[in-house]
């Protein structure tokens, strides 16, 4: 399964990473890598939760 990850930089310099196909999967980070890692971890939790229910 492939999902799109969108990354933007906020005005305050933080990065935000979002998976549009998974509502609520949105994560901030001080760096792009940090935001991506947090969004990936959250996406995995959301997908695992969906499989359990």
Regions found by a protein language model. Name each.
Residues 1-14, 18, 22, 26, ...:
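N-terminal segment of the canonical double-stranded RNA-binding domain
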Residues 37-53:
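A short N-terminal helical cap/helix-turn-helix that marks the beginning
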Residues 33-34:
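N-terminal amphipathic alpha-helical interaction or autoinhibitory segments
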């Amino acid at each position: 399964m492939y999902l799109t990850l969108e990354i933007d930089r906020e005005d305050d310099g933080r990065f935000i990473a979002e998976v549009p196909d998974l509502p609520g999967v949105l994560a901030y980070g001080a760096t792009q890598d940090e935001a991506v890692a947090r969004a990936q971890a959250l996406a995995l939790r959301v997908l695992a939760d969906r499989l359990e229910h």
